[in-house]
Amino acid sequence: MLQIKSISKRYKTGDFVQQALDKVSLNLRDSEFVAILGPSGSGKTTLLNIIGGLDRYDDGDLVINGISTRQYKDRDWDSYRNHTIGFVFQSYNLIPHQTILSNVELALTISGIGKADRRERARKALEKVGLGEHINKKPNQLSGGQMQRVAIARALVNDPDIVLADEPTGALDSRATDELLDLFEKINDSGQTILMVTHSVKAASRAGRILFIRDGQVYHQL
């Protein structure tokens, strides 16, 4: 379980200080599907990045399975990201000249896993997202929804405890959005926690819990 305890984050540009997060507290339970809903500039992506270890908080604490991260070094954050977190972003960030199998396999290259095992794990991840018959295709041969599924497979290939998704449906049409949210529900049913940032009420409604964020504060939840 993750506990976010009164976390604040500020960004400084010269003499200007922007309060991105203001004493945010919440618990993220195991095997939960949570949506963070809010407008642009509300702090939702900053919160996601801090939970994922991509950004550092200024005040408060992020507690991982009962352990404070206040004294975490870079290597601790690296280990946390590599073993606990899978990231899905709105932009697919796929390498265009490589097959989707190779794109997913790349996520395992720094893990010390042998090539044959990497390829097998990448294949299984693509099968899990419904792309088992497309593993030798390149990104430009896929639809937007399919490319986002490749990005999800890449996030799943390390078998993370938590999947963090930042506006994953933002570039998709209505049908592809519904299919992607169906997939997230399936992943969540298998036991993985999903935290999804979105500005779409429709997308957020598919989650088991919705956190409403505005001006850097979580002001309501359903």
Question: Where are the regions that the model predicts?
Answer:
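ABC family nucleotide-binding domain
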Residues: 2-213
